[in-house]
Amino acid sequence: MFHQKQFRNYCRCHAINNFLGYKAIPYEQFDKYCNEFDKLNNMPLISKNNCYFYNNGGNNNIFGYVLEKVKYICKLETFYSDKNIISKIGHCDTIDGFIIFNNHHTWCIRKVNRKFHLIDSMKWMITPLNNEKLSQYLRGCKGIITIKEISH
């Protein structure tokens, strides 16, 4: 399974690539997408330099923008520090993965063959998560973006 390791402050890029399962976005291209996204949103070019991702709900964030650029059409939904996350996201069968974030880092959980795997660019190994471990893990996260593929 693809596992891109940490390089500089590109954890958001690693999270997207790890979720997709291949190096879809080189670092230089990720920087360009950040700059484009900031200009579209009249922001002072903060996505690339400050690792900010401007979350206005749904797909209107750097993750939705980049996933659309690589033709991965999906629906994103964001939750913050929510102990009831599992009841709110519903059945995980419809979810393809998660982008997990806190103030300092971003990583992903990816579904492969109907099983979830924690893929963190700062960790040495990929960690499989059964439904119980997934539920426990998500309850402890500061921020979660669910990913549901519409078409690819």
What are the residue ranges of the model-derived segments?
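Generic preference for well-ordered alpha-helical elements
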Residues: R8, R12-C13, Y27, N60, ...
